[in-house]
Amino acid sequence: MKVEIYTDGACKGNPGPGGWGVLLRYNGREKTLHGGEPQTTNNRMELMAAIKGLEALKRPCEVDLYTDSQYLQQGMKEWIKTWKRNGWRNSKKELVKNAELWKSLDNLASIHNINWHWVKGHSGHLENDLVDALANLGIEELS
């Protein structure tokens, strides 16, 4: 099954209250998801959005995942292989930040065939604007 997933994370303060939003599109249908955490970072919410989107898939899929986070996109396309090879340490030999989320995302990604796409945020991209609003709703619902 071919699936499009659009993801976004948001944070009020960094760290601070954060939210994530997801749009899944498949077989002409759409499903949205959102949530939040009271104390987190923007990067953690970007990762959580991708994790929650992939967790929603019930079987292996062909996935086009769209994010406005270069951290997420480059992490999955470029950096993660080196991190794994180096025991989850970066080029400075420091432990990778958010390693537990990266590991979870890597495990989920291994189930699917994923193309990771970067889109410019806040540029009138319809789906990105929708998941941005969902991420902010995740923050609002915390209070």
Swiss-Prot record:
Cofactor-binding details, from the entry: Binds 1 Mg(2+) ion per subunit. May bind a second metal ion at a regulatory site, or after substrate binding.
GO biological process: DNA replication, removal of RNA primer
Protein origin, superkingdom: Bacteria
InterPro entries: RNase_H, RNaseH-like_sf, RNaseH_domain, RNaseH_sf, RNaseHI
Compartments it resides in: Cytoplasm
Binding site for Mg(2+) 1: D8, E46, D68
Keywords of this entry: Cytoplasm, Endonuclease, Hydrolase, Magnesium, Metal-binding, Nuclease
Entry EC number(s): 3.1.26.4
One GO location term (cellular component): cytoplasm
GO molecular function: magnesium ion binding; nucleic acid binding; RNA-DNA hybrid ribonuclease activity
Record: residues binding Mg(2+) 2: D8, D132
Catalytic activity entry: Endonucleolytic cleavage to 5'-phosphomonoester
RNase H type-1 domain mapped to chain residues: 1-140
Cofactor(s) essential for the protein: Mg(2+)
Role summary: Endonuclease that specifically degrades the RNA of RNA-DNA hybrids.
Xref: HAMAP family: RNase_H
Family of this protein: Belongs to the RNase H family.
Subunit record text: Monomer.
PANTHER family: RIBONUCLEASE H1 (PTHR10642:SF26)
Protein's name in the database: Ribonuclease H
Species this chain originates from: Legionella pneumophila (strain Lens)
